Amino acid sequence: MLNFNSPIKEQKKYNDLNIIEVEPIIKINLRSNKREFSTKIGKILSILPPNEANTSSGNEKFNLLWLSIDEWLIYSNDKEMSLDDQTNLEDKLFNEISKLNQGAVTNVSDHWVMINLNGNKVYD
């Protein structure tokens, strides 16, 4: 299993701008061009993959971000998701999609960092 070692150790504060890394959460890349894929994801996650550029769909547990015509990124809304739950999700997706040649499932949790920006100068 992945071991998260963040290079960002503290919150950065500037004039009316705060920058902090969001705690590491599971991120899984999905790729498929099969029709059955959307239905299968809908059953597993209770979310239908978005089919328009730069859109997302989600529920209380997960968000699904459209990356390209045949690519999506799942990330968890639950910062407290246990390692067992993360492993179970990845295994379920792998068994239901990759093993059945419906698409590709890749854990990219260590490839992406989520950063929270807040303050009056976020849009400057």
Question: Can you name each region flagged by the protein language model?
Answer:
Residues M1-D124:
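Basic, glycine/lysine-rich polyanion-binding surfaces/domains
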